[in-house]
């Protein structure tokens, strides 16, 4: 029962984040297309792609540091892994679609950023085995390009929890 109430709160928080990010004026948003490779345990690789909208940055001060945060919303796809003799009994051979919303923090070091999102996973696999997932991203963004290291997991609230770790490169416009 306790699990169900936590799950309901996480769903409400995710929905609120997606609504806020979706309400961004189009002229205030930066759009990004990202692609790369995702790895799970055992060196099993898959393709990954994301489409992101990042809102206008909001500056704030934390001690002596001048930082900014920006809302973000993303749609993502993690491709299937090929069927092999080693993974024939694992649930890894179909794609997973994600919708996520959260925030990006920047200004702490040059053009680096840290993002944290809550995600809804439409499909399940042994890597993303619950409808809700946590997404953490560490990256660098230029005027037109970005590179990011991202991890997606449900924090072991549901097993199996292999998670996905990926390196993404993208363009901004």
Show the residue positions of the predicted features.
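Transmembrane beta-strands of outer-membrane beta-barrel pores
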Residues: 35-41, 56, 73-81, 107-111, ...
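Residues that define the transmembrane beta-barrel architecture of outer-membrane proteins
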Residues: 44-54, 93-99, 130-134, 141-143, ...
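Cleavable N-terminal export/targeting peptides
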Residues: 1-30
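Transmembrane beta-strands of outer-membrane beta-barrel proteins
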Residues: 29-33, 65-73, 99, 110-116, ...
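Predominantly the C-terminal beta-signal and adjacent terminal strand-loop region
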Residues: 29, 130-173
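Flexible, solvent-exposed loop segments that connect beta-strands
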Residues: 77-94, 124-126
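Short glycine/proline- and aromatic-enriched beta-strand/turn motifs that initiate or cap beta-hairpins
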Residues: 26-85, 164-172
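Short, positively charged, low-complexity/disordered linker segments
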Residues: 115-139
């Amino acid at each position: 029962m306790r699990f169900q109430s936590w799950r309901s709160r996480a769903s409400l928080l995710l929905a609120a984040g997606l609504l806020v990010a979706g309400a961004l004026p189009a002229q205030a948003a930066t759009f990004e297309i990202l692609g790369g490779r995702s790895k799970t345990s055992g060196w099993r690789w898959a393709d990954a792609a994301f489409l992101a909208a990042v809102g206008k940055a909001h500056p704030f001060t934390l001690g002596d540091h001048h930082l900014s945060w920006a809302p973000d919303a993303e749609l993502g796809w993690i491709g299937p892994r090929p069927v092999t003799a080693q993974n024939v009994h694992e649930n890894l051979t179909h794609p997973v679609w994600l919708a996520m919303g959260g925030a990006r923090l920047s200004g702490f070091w040059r053009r680096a950023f840290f993002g944290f999102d809550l995600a809804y996973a439409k499909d399940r696999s042994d890597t993303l085995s619950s409808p809700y997932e946590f997404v953490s991203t560490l990256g660098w963004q230029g005027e037109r390009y970005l590179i990011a290291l991202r991890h997606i997991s449900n924090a072991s609230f549901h097993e199996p929890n292999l998670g996905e770790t990926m390196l993404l490169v993208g363009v901004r416009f």
